Each structure stands twice: as C-alpha cells, then as structure tokens.
Amino acid sequence: MSDYEGSGPTEGIDYGHSMVVWPSTGLISGGDVKPGGSSGIAPSMPPGWGDYSPQGIALVQSVLFPGIIRRIILDKELEEGDWSGWSVSVHSPWGNEKVSAARTVLENGLRGGLPEPSRPAAVSFARLEPASGNEQKIIRLMVTQQLEQVTDIPASQLPAAGNNVPVKYRLMDLMQNGTQYMAIIGGIPMTVPVVDAVPVPDRSRPGTNIKDVYSAPVSPNLPDLVLSVGQMNTPVLSNPEIQEEGVIAETGNYVEAGYTMSSNNHDVIVRFPEGSDVSPLYISTVEILDSNGLSQRQEAENKAKDDFRVKKEEAVARAEAEKAKAELFSKAGVNQPPVYTQEMMERANSVMNEQGALVLNNTASSVQLAMTGTGVWTAAGDIAGNISKFFSNALEKVTIPEVSPLLMRISLGALWFHSEEAGAGSDIVPGRNLEAMFSLSAQMLAGQGVVIEPGATSVNLPVRGQLINSNGQLALDLLKTGNESIPAAVPVLNAVRDTATGLDKITLPAVVGAPSRTILVNPVPQPSVPTDTGNHQPVPVTPVHTGTEVKSVEMPVTTITPVSDVGGLRDFIYWRPDAAGTGVEAVYVMLNDPLDSGRFSRKQLDKKYKHAGDFGISDTKKNRETLTKFRDAIEEHLSDKDTVEKGTYRREKGSKVYFNPNTMNVVIIKSNGEFLSGWKINPDADNGRIYLETGEL
C-alpha cells in the first residue's frame, strides 16, 4: 500500500514513492456505487479507498522518466468487486540515467562487429536483486525511451496497432552467472509491436474523458497501464539520482545478448491519439525473478546456449559440406537439377520421347539400358547387385595377364528378353533396328586398383565395352585394353545444361562410321517406387522402356576369343550424384558398334569383306574404316534407282536378291532384313547365267 495509507484522496505526483492501487468496478456488496459517482464516497472501504481520484482511476503510483528504471507494485489481495489497474505519470528526460551511457558502449562495440554474428549484442545498465518472493504482490520494473531513441521510423509512419515496427535498440532483461540484468541490445534487425493508447473516461462526468490521461496494454496478462501525460513536456528543475529498491545502476561490458533474453519482459511502442500532441513512447516492462526463478532461468540459459552452440557447429559442418559438395560437383561437371516451370517440364518430356532420343536418368548406383525412342530400363537393388557380380567375374577372366588382347563376348540374352507379341514389333531387335546404350558404374570395370577422380579428362580402364548384334540378339563385348588397337583411355565428357528443357546434354564425338551423337540426361533423380509427398512441383519424367522383360541370373555364359582390331569405340564416362546426394559417381556408357546397326553387323561385314572389291573397295586390309566403306557401298547399291529386286538365294530361305544391271552386282538380304552377302555376277559362268535367266542364285 501507499506510504500515505489512511490519508484522504489527493491529486499530484509523489516522486520516489509507489502508491499501490487497485481500482474498483463498483460491484461491491450492498450497492451499485460507481467510482467517482454522485455519492461522493470511495468505491470501497479500506484497503485502497484513498488510492482513487474522484474520476474513478488509480492515483499515480510512480513517475516514468526516459532511461530511469521504476519499480511498480500491485496488490493481489482484492476486495469483492475490486477491479485491476495501475497508473503512472510520464515526464520529460531526467539526468543521471544509465541507458545513454550503455548505448554509447554498445554503439562503439558494434563498429567492430557483433560478438556472435547471428545474435544481437548487449550492454547492461542495471543489475537486479532477487525479488522478495511476496506472493501477495505483483512487482514490475518499467523503463521508457523516446521514439527516436529506439527507431528511425517517424511517428507518422508507424504501422497500425498489432503490427510490428523495426527498431535499432531494445531494453531487455538478461541472465549472466545467475544474476538478472537490464540491458540495451542491438546490432541485428528487430521489431516491437505497436499498441494504441485510448482516452480514459471521466466517471464523474459521463460522456467526457479525463484530460491528458490515456490507457494502453503494455504487458500480457496484466491490466492496461494508465498514463498521465500532462507533464510529459514540462522541464525537470532538478535531477537528483533516483534509486529504486533492488536496482543497482551499473554499465556492463559489450557482450552477446543472452540466450533467454526477454523471457521475463515485454516491450511495446505506445502511440497516442491523433491530435493529442503526445509523442509515441517505448515502454519495456520487466518481471523481477526470485531466487528460485533465477535458478530456473539460468538453467534454461545454459541449455539454450549449449543448444545454440551445437546447432551452430552443425550449421558450420553443413555449410562446409555444402561448399565441399559444390566444389566437387563443379570439378566433376555435375549440375544440380533446376527449378522446373510447367513449360520446361513439358518441353523436356517431349524431347525425351522423340523417336531418335537416347536418354539416361540420374538414378544412383544403377545399371541402365536405353534404346532410341523407347525409353530407359533401369536396374537397381538386387538385380543391379547381381549384374555387378557378373561384371566382377567377367573382369577377372578378361584381365588375365598372360593373355594378349582379348574379346570377351557376353550375351545379354540371359539378362534381357525382348518380349513384343508376334506381329507387334517382334522383328525389331535392339542393337540392329534400334540404337542401344548401356550404362553402369565405371568402378565395376575399373576394379579395386583404379581410383577415378573428378576433373580428369580420361580414365584408363582395364577393359572397355561395346554393344553388338550377335545372331539377332543384343550382346556386349568386353575388350581387354593395353595395346594400340584398344587403348585404355576412356574419354570423360561433361554434360551441358539446356536452359529450355532443364535437361543435360552430352555430345559423343563422331567416329569412323558414325556421326556425333547427343545423349540426354534427366538430372532429376527418379524414385524407385511412385510416391506422393504432397510436393507437386513440375519435374520431367524419364520415359520407361517397357518392351523388355527382365529377370535376374547368377552368371551369364561368356566366351573368350582373340581379336586383332575393333577400331574406334563409342564409349565415355560422365559423372552423376551418388546415392547420398553429397558425392559423385563415375558412370561408364557404351553404345552400339556403328557397324552393328540397321541391317548390318560387324561380324557379317567382316565375313563377306572378301567381296568388297566387287563394290569398289580396293584396300584389302580389314579395319573399321574399310568395313565402313564396304557397308556404305552396299547401302549405295541398295538405294540406286537402277537396282531391282530379282529372285532369291537358294541357300537362305525367304531371302531377297537385289540386282543392278549396270554394275552386275547383287546384294542378298535375309528374311529378317539383315545383310547376308553380296558380289558381282559373272554372266559367263554357269551360276551367273542361271541367275540372270531364272532369278535363282
């Protein structure tokens, strides 16, 4: 209660004293008397009768000066019908305040940077002694600042009530070594809510307001604060230092703000009604902790600090990992998937489904088989594991030291079975009618002794591969390297991002018999199973090859034969993200032998090269270049306008013979469309004469 309990109601300001009040609702037993009503008596009997003005508001409990901490005490003991409320008088600046000195230290410190870059800096200006622990009292410390002392936002630009305004400084409570402090903080973007002050009705004069008196909410769960502003602009004649109980004024060091700062305080900017000529006021209200509260707060402070340290260390580790990842991806030429628009996705899907497209997806640790215009088959999990074992075994066989260059032919028929129904594409053979591409982890072929590092332009492998058409079936040749015919160096090609589709493009250089080739890579990882995570951002989907049935086998049968020349291989290595997404893995890609495409196979061209001279090929040495010339000469023969279909070849059922009377050359095509042979007809020989007369060759 007030030091003057028992005296009659008075007007005026009691400097340095707290007049504890609790205004009444007037709903008291025995009547319906309103505070300041016509009865002229107090709203209730003691305690508290002398703490009200005739207008029905609490008398001034304390005086607020900018930068001076004031102690406000409210009684929890209420008489029946009493109502809550507290009242202060707001004055012009007072000397001997400590906030300005602390602000100077803070500003000087900020010029050198924040103590902790992610947190505000602080300088304390008061140390708070523990509360007495009187459960019948509500104790708050209150300190104010003029608007321009906390923000550069002018009064005219403050947002509507309930919104926040950016501020440079705030007055907060902190914990340090078990002690509660008041401090000024700054150095990072901060905001404070705006509240509107409203006029207080004069209960002695219904329909009017009390002059220069307003109320505003300044702290949650406590009554609105009544502010008397009549002397706000009145100069103070003297400035003796104001000492509040339990508040020790002292300027602290420049430190990082506490990790539980503002846990026990609330601050607002109070805006007064337009036309009041009262400037907005920053008010911070602080709850003083008792010894038990201090212990709990310090424990929370320590835990928050430890949590922050752990999170910071984790953030630093993540940042370092992201930096290392970015450097690694850049070195390997790997681009992260872009953010796709609907238009980009549609373009990408359209391009990947074009008839001549060869596409790979970015599924990590996968084995893939792609064919032009028919999508990609992807092996992962157990199937990919079995294929890996298969290649490991094959690698052991083909790299026998005492054996010279070897050709290891591995039939993929045991792994992939073409399964179109008869009449619905059963004559279409991958590797003959369709260009095919096979990819796997480069480490499968490199073996344990070879380290593949990002940034290299080529990688030496003990074996290289190519896809071929063998007896109408897709097969894979593994070729031992280490000689002039089969060099060990496999080129590493980097993907180039196409901005229109978001796809990556890898350009395979031209070789003898085949032009340059563009390979498309979808950079978006493909899920192993369909998922619906709620994220419906548009992304392109790699077309899936469905024309092939796949089953897992333990070990396909292999055959090993010497080989003298294979010419230029169509293979390369590129990099993609690994399964974890933090590293990269090298992918080895092989394509068809150019001579194993369409109606031709390298084997058959090699076998029938003895007739190459009949088609104008004078070089008797068989190699990729001469075999390509032989193939092209046969194609030229078939496309010549004077070439006609004439008869069949008696040794090949269902075959067709194409004859050109100008050159006297014939080319035999098997019933399945494959090239069988070709030579020049001698009309003077019996077989030549019979063919010309009967069409039977």
Curated annotation (Swiss-Prot):
GO terms for cellular component: extrachromosomal circular DNA. A motif (TonB box) lies at residues 17-24. InterPro entries: Cloacin_colicin, Colicin_D/E5_nuclease, ColicinD_C, ColicinD_C_sf, Pyosin/cloacin_T_dom, Pyosin/cloacin_T_dom_sf. Keywords: Antibiotic, Antimicrobial, Bacteriocin, Plasmid, TonB box. It holds the Pfam family Pyocin_S. SUPFAM superfamilies: Cloacin translocation domain (SSF69369), Colicin D/E5 nuclease domain (SSF102824). GO terms for biological process: defense response to bacterium; killing of cells of another organism. GO terms for molecular function: RNA nuclease activity. Colicins are polypeptide toxins produced by and active against E.coli and closely related bacteria. This colicin requires TonB for its uptake. Belongs to the cloacin colicin family. This is Colicin-D. It comes from Escherichia coli. The gene is cda.
